Amino acid sequence: MRVDLNCDLGEAFGNYSFGGDHQIIPLITSANVACGFHAGDENVMNETVKLAKAHNVAVGAHPGLPDLKGFGRRNIDISNDEIYNLMIYQLGALQGFCRIHQVKINHVKPHGALYQMGAKDREIASVIAQAVYDFDPSLVLVGLANSYLISEAKNVGLITASEVFADRRYEDDGQLVSRKESDAVITDTDEALKQVLKMVKENKVISKNNKEVTLQADTICVHGDGEHALLFVSKIREILMKEGIDIQSL
């Protein structure tokens, strides 16, 4: 049994610095690097790619909506053409830094509202998948398990990775509980570890209404901006190794 452990990183920009990227990267197998629209800038992107390479961590693009103020977590009324173009733009930006450090972009995971829009809307998911395929058909598209991001990526011929979350609660339909709700984020370490093991070993998660939901767990996400990110990543890695589960990049 194997699983990938990923984290959204490189989300500082300018004078705004947060997250424990230097401590987290050695513990994960895949880094989703912000590409400048929701967070990150040219200096942070360069440093994050360099750091990932130093620790043999797979580099992935983490493109988001153009919303620095809202950290890319607010829905924006945006056309399909704009979605396609912002995907290509951000992938190109990251590719530049990957090229100078002689590493390859391994995967793409949309961020925040863009991720949720793609998970719930087949047409948006199709646009996202097509953009990734047109940029590089060898890339892995990471999306919410059982969502349109996964099905539409498969439809265009992309390799997919179904993502599950250690630090988020689930609805009965397998969607994530909205961050607008007070119970959306898991902050208790034991609860997070219990959820992770059930998802990885049984391909199931218990929803907020105590319903058992079936899902595929190819990669586990911990949000890098979360208060408990470093602790969660450390403990998840520890318990997976204890259970004999291989932690490997996508």
Swiss-Prot record:
The UniProt record lists the EC number as 3.5.2.9
Extract one GO molecular function annotation from the record: ATP binding
Quaternary structure note: Forms a complex composed of PxpA, PxpB and PxpC.
- Alphabetical GO biological process terms: carbohydrate metabolic process
Keyword list (alphabetical) reads:
ATP-binding, Hydrolase, Nucleotide-binding
Question: Which named protein is this?
Answer: 5-oxoprolinase subunit A
The superkingdom listed in its UniProt entry is: Bacteria
Report the sequence similarity comment from the record.
Answer: Belongs to the LamB/PxpA family.
For this protein, what reaction is catalysed?
Answer: 5-oxo-L-proline + ATP + 2 H2O = L-glutamate + ADP + phosphate + H(+)
Query: Which of the seven top EC classes does this enzyme belong to?
Result: hydrolase
Q: What does this protein do?
A: Catalyzes the cleavage of 5-oxoproline to form L-glutamate coupled to the hydrolysis of ATP to ADP and inorganic phosphate.
Pfam family example for this protein? LamB_YcsF
